[in-house]
Amino acid sequence: MKKVKKKRSEARRHRDSTSQHASSNSTSQQPSPESTPQQPSPESTPQQPSPESTPQHSSLETTSRQPAFQALPAPEIRRSSCCLLSPDANVKAAPQSRKAGPLIRAGPHSCSCATCPCSSACWRRLGLCHSRIFDVLLPRDWQMAPGRGLPNLLTFYRKSSRKPSSHRNACPPSPRNCGCGSGGSRSCLLHH
């Protein structure tokens, strides 16, 4: 009992000395090494850990919330990377369209529907002459485009040396009969 009372009185003395020491060093509010042994006192321990514990809990809560927030952006990043892949595909498609930028301006050609690319995209049905369409759509370096055979431009710009009866004929029935000479519907300018 006496030891407990002595410890309490010593703790009070230390508190008084530290309060005087703290008032004298008001500019430096850092606790001195003498104040560190005071922390085990029963009155000071509930005061100090309670303010410290609440920020720690809030910091723990914020850190526990931060991984939750970080977990949410991670899928968004993946989604954006997926989205980045699609713009890359668009970017890959863009240079092809840029290659298609400079267009050939050919002279006026008479339309002969026998050379119309296919029945599904018959420009005559659309009310447009296919030779005019290809004057606008066919790029200069289309022959150099990878994956496409070298088309014979005469298939596109064939003069109307045929009889006018050929105009009465319908376009070829299927894309396989495409007049572009590339051999397949996927390599056709209108069927890619």
From Swiss-Prot:
Q: Where is this region: Disordered?
A: 1-65, 161-184
Protein name as it appears in the record: Spermatogenesis-associated protein 3
Positions with biased composition (Low complexity): 19-59
What the entry lists under InterPro entries is as follows: SPATA3
State its location(s).
Answer: Cell projection, Cilium, Flagellum
Coiled-coil region: none
- Give GO cellular component annotations, separated by semicolons: sperm flagellum
Q: Where is the composition biased (Basic residues)?
A: 1-15
Record's keyword terms, sorted:
Cell projection, Cilium, Flagellum
